[in-house]
């Protein structure tokens, strides 16, 4: 559930700024808009042709998504607790070679690969998930080099994100406030 401004920012970042010294990780990729934007940018980045986007989601339709889906092409396509992974795969088919799908519960997920250069977080919907993401992914960030995009930073309904940013203020500074969205990049 992203804006065109966010998608443009992600595409531009992956095409022009991303250096390929660490992974791109998309937490809470939903139906693939952010994953596609990052993959499109990677395709334009000559320094990172072999890189991939690691897309994480539980891919389970939640009752909360019903209101968002109303009036959209996906309205009525999914059942609560059913998988929407096939829809994600259909939408991202064109970029399948540069996307690694991780169908995982982020309260249990643990990054096991190389360093993370870019971490997009659209999954800190509860304090428990936020804590798990901090433990499972943040230790792999490159000091002074990685970017963390917090998709829900501008919203008052996820105050734990602001508390996390405050606690980590000595390690992160604001790089961008993406217009027309709730995303802040550190």
Regions found by a protein language model. Give the residues of each.
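S-adenosylmethionine/decaboxylated-SAM
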Residues: 15-186
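Conserved SAM-binding loop and adjacent beta-strand
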Residues: 1-9
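Pre-Walker A adenine-sensing motif
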Residues: 10-14
């Amino acid at each position: 559930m992203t804006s065109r401004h966010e998608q443009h920012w992600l595409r531009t970042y992956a095409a022009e700024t991303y250096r390929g010294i660490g992974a791109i990780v998309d937490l809470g990729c939903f139906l693939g808009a952010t994953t596609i934007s990052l993959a499109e940018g990677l395709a334009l980045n000559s320094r990172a042709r072999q890189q991939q986007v690691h897309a994480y989601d539980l891919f389970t339709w939640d009752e909360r998504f019903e209101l968002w889906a109303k009036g959209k092409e996906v309205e009525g396509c999914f059942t609560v607790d059913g998988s929407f992974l096939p829809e994600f795969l259909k939408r991202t088919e064109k970029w399948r070679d540069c996307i690694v799908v991780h169908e995982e519960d982020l309260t249990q997920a643990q990054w096991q690969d190389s360093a993370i250069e870019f971490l997009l977080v659209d999954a800190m919907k509860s304090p428990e998930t936020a804590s798990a993401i901090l433990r499972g992914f943040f230790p792999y960030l490159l000091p002074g080099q990685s970017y963390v995009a917090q998709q829900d930073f501008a919203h008052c309904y996820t105050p734990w994100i602001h508390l996390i940013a405050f606690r980590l203020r000595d390690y992160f500074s604001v790089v961008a406030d993406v217009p027309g969205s709730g995303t802040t990049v550190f």
